[in-house]
Amino acid sequence: MLESANECAYAVAEHVGGTVENFVQMMNDKAAELGCVNTHFNNPHGLSEGEDATLHYTCCYDMALIAKAAYQNETFRAITATKTYQIPPTNKHDEITYLQNHNEMIHAFKTRGQYLYEYCVGGKTGYTTAANSTLVTFAEKDDMTLICVIMNAQSPAQWTDSIALYNYYFENFSLYNVAQNETRLENGEMDTGMLNTNSSFVKIDPAGNIVLPKSAEFSEAAPAVSYDNTSDDVLANIRYTFAGHDVGGADIVSTGVKADTFSFD
């Protein structure tokens, strides 16, 4: 990943999928599972020449969905944050192989640090003649982890645009923990259908967050409770909208308290 070694992409594809074709199908299946609607992979490395030019494509939104899923993987996070790496001598190569991350936002690769960004924690560069310079990055500040996707950029716009977008978001938006700020649920001011939230057996999952403009109050976010994605522990879901946009949510979960009966309205 650090050096964009396409031959390694083929090796991974054959190791994981058995064949390159099977692995590419796995890639497309995973993209569909993540909710991608404008993506189709035709190879494991990303180059799109010849036949691949029409069969291998994606968009910024879909790539952000894929990046979000990838960032959940601890090994991926470690690799994408690595600035330099040394491969020791092997039976095929008797010298150390030095690798450098091409992401100028975390490592001064060619630009002498001109585009280093203190909040960037990883990312991946790309380039094809059709897509021009592309860049997916991750940045963390004030408990927020953001993903930025830039495509069809004329260098150095992939760096400058990413930094400008991150700065705008960090300066104008804040993260709110739902469990710490939501009072309408326990006060009975939220339409929850049949679930009786006055019960001591339910609570809001503390992992849930929403993002709002710094000029807005948490109470201005409109909640909606659904039962679409439930499990043994997740009893319901709250999603919030602000100015017509989904801004995050949280699960309503069981407190783990055992009872002979469970309270519903």
Task: Label each PLM-derived region with a short phrase.
Residues 36, 54-265:
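Domain-terminus/edge residues, biased toward the C-terminal soluble/receptor-binding domains
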Residues 2, 32, 99:
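Cell-wall glycan
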Residues 2-9, 56-60:
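Short alpha-helical patches at coil-to-helix transitions and adjacent helical residues
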Residues 4, 19, 23, 157:
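Catalytic cores of large soluble enzymes that bind and process phosphate-bearing ligands
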Residues 14-75:
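Mid-domain, small-residue-enriched loop/turn segments at the edges of structured enzyme/sensor domains
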Residues 1-5, 12-16, 42-46, 79-83, ...:
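Active-site-proximal beta-strand/loop segments in catalytic clefts of secreted hydrolases
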Residues 10, 28, 119:
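Short glycine-/small-residue-rich flexible loop motifs, especially phosphate/cofactor-binding loops
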